[in-house]
Amino acid sequence: PVTAYLRSDSTPDDGLELELVYVENALPANLLGVEGKAVLVNGRFGFEAYGRIQKAKPAAIIGFTGNILDKDDETDHGICKIRETYTAEFGDNILVNLKAKDALEIVSKGAKKVKLFVSSTATESESRNVCVTLRGTDLADEIVSFGAHYDSVLFSTGAYDNMSGSVIIMELLRYFVANPPRRTLKFNWFGS
């Protein structure tokens, strides 16, 4: 099983059967001859790698998240998103994500073809940040900033990524409200 990237293109209703090519870290030499095929990339890919991949014109891109030691009953399929900055620069594609151990099995067994079914609808939503400033006493022009994101990270339970960071800076804020700081402190919770 796979999950589609948020903002992925859709396949036709009857799916898309493609030749599969493992392109490792998507270096230029690995991307030769992949036009019209599905490419399996090591892990997730950044802006530059996405650009290289798109330049090679594959019909679909497959990445993976997690670790080969992840236990099925303790982890979800990672939900990934292709950022607008990527697609604005390099275009859209069909993008899916699978678990690392499934990617290992696909490569180990020498899979040659994949059939993908992706139904995706683009939506826009708004995210908000929460910012609190505590003005310092005698060194108010010096600023110390704390930040954490409070959006959902679906691959984890949220306790570590990043609820713990959000709670820690909330407790720091509580402390410094009761004990005014010498320097100005900024506390920032980011929605995404």
Placement of each model-derived feature along the sequence:
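Protein/peptide-recognition domains central to ubiquitin and immune signaling
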Residues: P1, G63-G66, D70-I82
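Noncatalytic luminal/extracellular "stalk/propeptide" segments of secretory-pathway proteins
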Residues: P1-A38
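Second-shell loop/turn segments in exported
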Residues: R7, T11, Y22, V39-R44, ...
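Short beta-strand-to-loop junctions in surface cap/lid or active-site-entrance loops
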Residues: S10, A26-P28, C131-A140
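Structural recognition of the beta-strand scaffold that forms the well-ordered cores
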Residues: L20-Y22, A38-V41, A60-G63, L95-N97, ...
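Alpha-helical metal-binding/catalytic segments enriched in His/Glu/Asp
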Residues: G43, V130, E142, F146-S192
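Non-catalytic positions within long, well-ordered alpha-helices that form the structural scaffold/packing
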Residues: I53-K57
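Intrinsic low-complexity, polar/charged intrinsically disordered segments
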Residues: K101-A103, I169
